[in-house]
Amino acid sequence: MFPVRHALLCKALGCYDCCIRCLGAVPYPSLVSTLLCFTGMALFCGCGHEALAHTEVLVETYFVRNIQDYVILASFIKYFQYVIYGLASFFFLYCILLLAEGFYTTSAVKQTFGEFRSTRCGRCLSLTFIIVTYVLAVIWLAVFAFTAIPSSSSLIWHRPATTSTSWTETTPSINQHGWICMDARQYGLLPWNAMPGKACGMTLASICKTKEFFVTYDLYIAAFAGAGIALLALFLYVVATTYNYAVLRFLGRKGLRC
C-alpha cells in the first residue's frame, strides 16, 4: 500500500518527522470503529450462541416431556448458531477491509506520501464501501431490534424467578404461591399442546435456583449490548468513509493531486 519512495522519504526527513507523518496517516475513526465492531460482534456471537444453548437445555429439562414438542425449537437454535458462525467470519473480514480502505483514503486526503494518491477506481471502491456499509447498518438495525425480543423476554422471566426465590426463603411452603408460573408456550418457544409447557410452585423455585437460568439472563443482555456496539461501529464507519470520499471528490474537482 505504501510507495517505494517511503523509505527514502523517511531517510531524508529523519525518524521523528517520519513517525509524525505516519501517525498522521492513521485513520483513527476507522480504527476505533474496527475495535468497536470486533468487541460488539464478539459479545453478540459468543454470548448469543451460549444463551441459545442454555435456553435449549432449560426448555428440554423443565418444560417438556415429549421430545417432539421442542424439535422445532432445537432445529431453530441449531440453524441460528450456524448463522452466528457466518456473521462472525464475515464481519471480521469486512472490518479488516474497511480499516485498509480507511488507511488508503486518509493517506490520500492528507497527501502524506508524495506518490500516494487516489484514482477514479479507488474513489469508486470507496463509494462501494459506503453503500455496502450503509446497507449493512440498516440490516443490523433490524437485527438489533430482533435481539431486544429475547432480552426483554428474559427480563420478564427474571422477575417471577426473583419473586419465587425470595418467597421460598420466607415462606414455609412454596406451594402456597402456586399461582406464580412461567409459561414457555406464550413466548413461542413451544407449541400450545406441549405438556407441561409451564413451571409453577416447587418446579419454578428449583429452576430459579439453577446457575443456568441466571447465566442465560446475563448472556441475552450481553448479546443485546454487543449488537448495539456493532451497530454504533457501522454508523461510525459510514460517517468516516463518507467524509473521506467527500474530501477526495472536492479535491479532485479543484484539480489538486489527491
Curated annotation (Swiss-Prot):
Entry keywords, A to Z: Cell membrane, Disulfide bond, Lipoprotein, Membrane, Palmitate, Transmembrane, Transmembrane helix
Name of the molecule in the record: Myelin proteolipid protein
Extracellular topological domain: 49-82, 150-218
Pfam entry (one): Myelin_PLP
Subcellular localization, as worded in the UniProt entry: Cell membrane
Topology within the bilayer: Multi-pass membrane protein
Source organism: Oncorhynchus mykiss (Rainbow trout)
Gene Ontology annotations of biological process type: axon development; central nervous system myelination
TM stretches of this protein: 23-48, 83-103, 129-149, 219-239
Lipidation (S-palmitoyl cysteine): C18, C19, C22, C121, C124
Molecular function (Gene Ontology), one example: structural constituent of myelin sheath
Disulfide bridge positions per record: C181-C200
Role according to the record: This is the major myelin protein from the central nervous system. It plays an important role in the formation or maintenance of the multilamellar structure of myelin. May be involved in neuron and glial cell differentiation.
